[in-house]
Amino acid sequence: MNTSSRSSEPSKVADDVYVQTRWNNEFKHADYLPESLQKCLDQEKTVLERYSELVEVSKTVANESSQALVKHTTKPGDQLVRRVFQQPHQQISLMERYEKTRSYKPQWHAPWKLSKVINGHTGWVRCVCVDPVDNEWFATGSNDTTIKIWDLAAGKLKITLIGHVMSVRDIAISKRHPYMFSASEDKLVKCWDLERNTAIRDFHGHLSGVHTVDVHPSLDIIATAGRDAVVRLWDIRSRSEIMVLPGHKSPINKVKCLPVDPQIISCSGDATVRLWDIIAGKASKVLTHHSRNIRDLTLHPAEFSFASVSTNDVRSWKLPEGQLLTNFQSQNTGILNTVSINHDNVLLAGGDDGTLCFYDYKTGHKYQSMMTTEVAGSLESERSILCSTFDVTGTRLITGEGDKSIKIWKQVPDATEDTFPGLPWNPTLISQRF
């Protein structure tokens, strides 16, 4: 019995060394993990833990080959193997997380500067929207109850549309029809024929002021919302209300439509963002990460994601599940009224105090912060950014402001990373991409 027991020990050691050698030879030159191993890693890593234990056992084996193998596994090319077979309780430390976050290098973006100031409205400029087809003109709505259409290149007024009797809060232009829709505090949503420059339809149904409107990109419907805290869907042709989506507890500030689920996204003063399932007629997801009034949200023009802003808080979200992507470096930015994103991953957040904050969308890094230019004769209290949008190319930024002006901003053409390094990249553990 004793002889048999002693004879089995060398066999077990040999098996252990053989298994270890196989694993090291398999992965010592690997730069990534096979999908099957990654799944094991995500499912408690039972097989991999066994291997990790074998590595530890081999350290105690008093023979030449096993000692050489242990030394071999400390080579740089094999560090991936040891990292894979960590025990589940070996979590990354806060300092390691911080250093990892700092190691990300944000994309460099050229700085922005004021290019043009346009005057014409006699009240706050509450909304702005660019022609999505030809990118040749843009429309603005104001507290003076009018909608004005401007030439984008020259900044000249083309026409003034009159029809609302109270402040115009939002504008949406259809890509599929020659129509523009406007939402107003007078409880009406109007459809404007851009070929005849007249209002051709009114949509009645909201119980109080309408704050936002958007056109569905593939269906003949529009979504509206406002002070009555419900989202309403309308048939464009018949003007009939086809669905009401209740759920928010406070006035809704912005609604956006998508061609795929979730087809409706809304944000509200109740500090929530809701993703709506219009087939079921209810919210499929409620995002509660913000703590204050969410004043605006916008879709990324190329990615399937969106961003939202509230006081001292800018966040981006992945669609369709609504997963939090990034906390932006937005501390001490104050009340934020508007957010816009271009194709180059530049995010603008416009503040109630007239601050324009420019961020790298991928990392949340604030690379430029500047104050808007005061218009002669305006009060300091009127220096607020109320709305914004990039043009179709993303090279021009248009802002509507509390001093009744419209401003067009462009990037500095000859800027380089050496001449404008931007604000320092000093992320915190709060500001990171998840």
From Swiss-Prot:
The keyword Oxidoreductase does not apply. WD repeats lie at residues 120-160, 163-202, 205-244, 247-288, 290-329, 331-369, 380-419. Gene3D superfamilies: YVTN repeat-like/Quinoprotein amine dehydrogenase. It is found in: Cytoplasm; Nucleus. Pfam families: WD40 (PF00400). One of its GO terms (biological process) is mRNA splicing, via spliceosome. CDD domains: WD40. Keywords: Cytoplasm, mRNA processing, mRNA splicing, Nucleus, Repeat, Spliceosome, WD repeat. The keyword Nucleus applies. One of its GO terms (cellular component) is catalytic step 2 spliceosome. InterPro entries: G-protein_beta_WD-40_rep, Prp46/PLRG1-like, WD40/YVTN_repeat-like_dom_sf, WD40_repeat_CS, WD40_repeat_dom_sf, WD40_rpt. Associated with the spliceosome. Belongs to the WD repeat PRL1/PRL2 family. Involved in pre-mRNA splicing and required for cell cycle progression at G2/M. This is Pre-mRNA-splicing factor PRP46. It comes from Kluyveromyces lactis (strain ATCC 8585 / CBS 2359 / DSM 70799 / NBRC 1267 / NRRL Y-1140 / WM37). The lineage of its organism: Eukaryota, Fungi, Dikarya, Ascomycota, Saccharomycotina.
